[in-house]
């Protein structure tokens, strides 16, 4: 399949995006998605502000684990579809406040992220196939960097007393945790994941934006020993500090147990439903590029970069 040429001024568009974001969140440290392919292993932090917790309500802490509660578990989250959720930097203005919602346990350890240059090693370590497009648009060139996130399982036991003490210590008001949620254990099974990126700088001191990313991960699952998805959503959305618009968008999700919210920068991107390889997907269009995400046969796929929506869809359809 031939992919048409495209020559956007990606650098100018990206500079404009950076300026708008930095203007609104100059006091905040870089987010996790700005450091997604680095040598540092990802760390699980207790849920932060209510807005952050609300956005992650359906997948409370993707990456957690199974320890002695399998017989009591009820599935509360296993995504097969996607919905856009409009967010702005101001929704996370207090993201530096970290609250302790309960005890986290790993089995045997937190997920690790490895950056590799060898595709065979990346495929072997992830257990996922290396995907190649039929052709690449001009401007998208190698070498390709590979990131492998290990499979992880773990558990979070929600604890009202710990949350209350953490909120008091940080000077933050939270609504009391209901008895139906207090003491529930959430078990999360996630990964592995494989990321292929074109155009990243080889220098760790020089920031760069990839021209193309192809990613895939096994569908994560979240199980609970007590609290239901509806109870978790209702409680988290009731917390002070959750923007009403954000809460309304999450409440509007018809089936939160099978739907993964995709945060979209407000005013910077639009979305639409599309068909990808015979299944429904979500296409994201922005001034500096485009992306598409879909799920098929228990794997979530994503393609994106400094390319047009038509090119994104052509690449997604040609993966082999």
Question: Residues of each region from the PLM?
Answer:
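Positively biased amphipathic helices and basic secretion/translocation or surface-docking motifs
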Residues: 2-44
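Intrinsically disordered, low-complexity prosegments and terminal tails associated
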Residues: 33-320
């Amino acid at each position: 399949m031939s992919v048409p040429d495209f020559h956007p001024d990606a650098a100018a568009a990206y500079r404009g995006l950076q300026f708008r974001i930095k203007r609104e969140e100059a006091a905040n440290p870089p987010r996790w998605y700005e450091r997604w392919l680095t040598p540092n292993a990802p760390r699980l932090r207790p849920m932060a502000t209510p807005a952050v917790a609300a956005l992650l309500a359906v997948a409370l802490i993707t990456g957690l684990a199974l320890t002695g509660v399998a017989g009591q578990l009820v599935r509360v989250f296993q995504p097969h579809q996607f919905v856009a959720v409009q967010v702005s930097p101001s929704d996370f203005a207090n993201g530096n406040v970290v609250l302790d919602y309960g005890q986290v346990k790993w089995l045997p350890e937190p997920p690790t992220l490895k950056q590799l240059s060898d595709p065979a090693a990346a495929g072997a370590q992830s257990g996922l196939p290396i995907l190649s497009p039929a052709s690449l648009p001009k401007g998208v060139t190698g070498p390709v960097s590979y990131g492998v996130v290990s499979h992880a399982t773990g558990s979070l036991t929600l604890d009202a007393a710990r949350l209350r003490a953490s909120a008091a210590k940080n000077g933050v008001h939270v609504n009391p945790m209901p008895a139906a949620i207090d003491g529930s254990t959430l078990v999360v099974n996630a990964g592995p994941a494989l990321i292929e990126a074109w155009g990243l700088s080889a220098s760790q001191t020089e920031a760069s934006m990839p021209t193309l990313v192809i990613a895939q991960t096994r569908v994560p699952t979240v199980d609970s020993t007590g609290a239901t998805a509806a109870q978790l959503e209702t409680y988290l959305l009731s917390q002070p500090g959750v923007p009403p618009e954000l809460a309304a968008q999450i409440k509007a999700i018809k089936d939160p147990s099978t739907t993964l919210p995709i945060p979209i920068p407000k005013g910077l991107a639009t979305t639409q439903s599309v068909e990808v390889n015979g299944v429904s997907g979500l296409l994201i269009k922005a001034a500096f590029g485009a992306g598409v995400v879909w799920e098929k046969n228990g794997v979530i796929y994503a393609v994106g970069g400094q390319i047009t929506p038509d090119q994104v869809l052509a690449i997604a359809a040609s993966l082999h």
